[in-house]
Amino acid sequence: MTKSDETTATSLNAKTLKSFESTLPIPTYPREGVKQGIVHLGVGAFHRSHLAVFMHRLMQEHHLKDWSICGVGLMKADALMRDAMKAQDCLYTLVERGIKDTNAYIVGSITAYMYAPDDPRAVIEKMANPDTHIVSLTVTENGYYHSEATNSLMTDAPEIINDLNHPEKPDTLYGYLYEALLLRYKRGLTPFTIMSCDNMPQNGVTVKTMLVAFAKLKKDEKFAAWIEDKVTSPNSMVDRVTPRCTDKERKYVADTWGIKDQCPVVAEPFIQWVLEDNFSDGRPPWELVGVQVVKDVDSYELMKLRLLNGGHSAMGYLGYLAGYTYIHEVVNDPTINKYIRVLMREEVIPLLPKVPGVDFEEYTASVLERFSNPAIQDTVARICLMGSGKMPKYVLPSIYEQLRKPDGKYKLLAVCVAGWFRYLTGVDMNGKPFEIEDPMAPTLKAAAVKGGKDPHELLNIEVLFSPEIRDNKEFVAQLTHSLETVYDKGPIAAIKEILDQV
């Protein structure tokens, strides 16, 4: 039943919080005068539906103190989040939308927010403060400046060059991590743990390896060795579908609960976090709220990245070209649904190490069921974002592994890459242009347009593709054929043709 609307809804903040307790659950733990044990870089929707929720549960159900979160916006684009966090005292509404039921509550585990472009030094000092035990990250795959093809730091990126030469005003997470750890080092303090919460294979190992490479470029070998020896960075597997917030969600929260919230979060009910127990300066007891804290995350991580994220990307590019708006519509397309199931069964699952207690085909089916949730309204366009960071981590590794096998199978994987390449032209199948949101968009689009049905222009981008894939004549021939079919007949026809061959 509608209780309010946007004109009569009450703005959410610390002063009004109590007025909502008869409508939905609110934080009952103290939020003032508590220490922030975690500094989180990159406060987007996913962080607020995942790590912040686990911390909220610990504070709400187990009365944990001094582990609240100080959020940090690194980019100029984070100004909108800064304004919302400031106006709302870092409170926000979380709406969990299932296929049948909806659950909502107010989250208060973020108790401070800093906007780095305004005062980078203040952020560095906050990270260096001994009360900070963990610096966590959700900066997207592109924020790591890691080339999957060369397994190295992108040292020619302008932002990395800036951070090497202008430590007083960093652009990347490495500039901030380096300067903050340097202060801890000079002050004789234990280093904080760097905890990546991004969807990447070996996310913890990757961020630490890239940070050490960055430190070595700064020509302080002793400090670089200290980072390598003392700083911990656990691997993790994170999972929760969390679409971008739009005015539609803001209106829904206002109409349903009478809350005027500038930054609500809508997510699926499912939530999972598998975390390596590797911390240098303590950690909260996450096991109490359902986090799987384990010795080795690798098998869980590969399963999720290859099956869920890889499947997501395949559905995204092919579904976009097929004219779909929402992911649940793509899942309900019988041809694409069958394609994802066969792709996983034939070309991805055989490459995966076993995960205790998990049947991979059942996992794939559960993923498709989650994606079919129409209440989430997850857009295909969102899934297509930042492909240069996603495809080399979610899809291309399976191709590399198949190419190394004498009887390697990759026809279905090639269709996914063909869909991505056709998408990168920035023009849909009806000739309508659209914007490609990707840090490499100008380079990718120029190569896609120039190459057309010939994939070589894109394959020659060395930061994305290694010679192993670029010089494999059989794979390139298969990719070329799939790309031609997508261009000439459309994505559904290309999928059907390949399904008939496997």
Curated annotation (Swiss-Prot):
Recorded superkingdom: Eukaryota
GO biological process, one term: mannitol metabolic process
Pfam families: Mannitol_dh (PF01232), Mannitol_dh_C (PF08125)
Catalysed reaction, written as an equation: D-mannitol + NAD(+) = D-fructose + NADH + H(+)
Keywords: NAD, Oxidoreductase
Gene Ontology molecular functions: mannitol 2-dehydrogenase activity; mannitol dehydrogenase activity
Enzyme Commission number(s) from the entry: 1.1.1.67
Disruption phenotype: Rescues temperature-sensitivity of MPT5 deletion.
Main function: Catalyzes the NAD(H)-dependent interconversion of D-fructose and D-mannitol in the mannitol metabolic pathway.
Additional notes on this entry: There are two genes for this mannitol dehydrogenase in yeast, DSF1 and YNR073C.
Family: Belongs to the mannitol dehydrogenase family.
Name assigned to this protein: Mannitol dehydrogenase DSF1
Organism: Saccharomyces cerevisiae (strain ATCC 204508 / S288c)
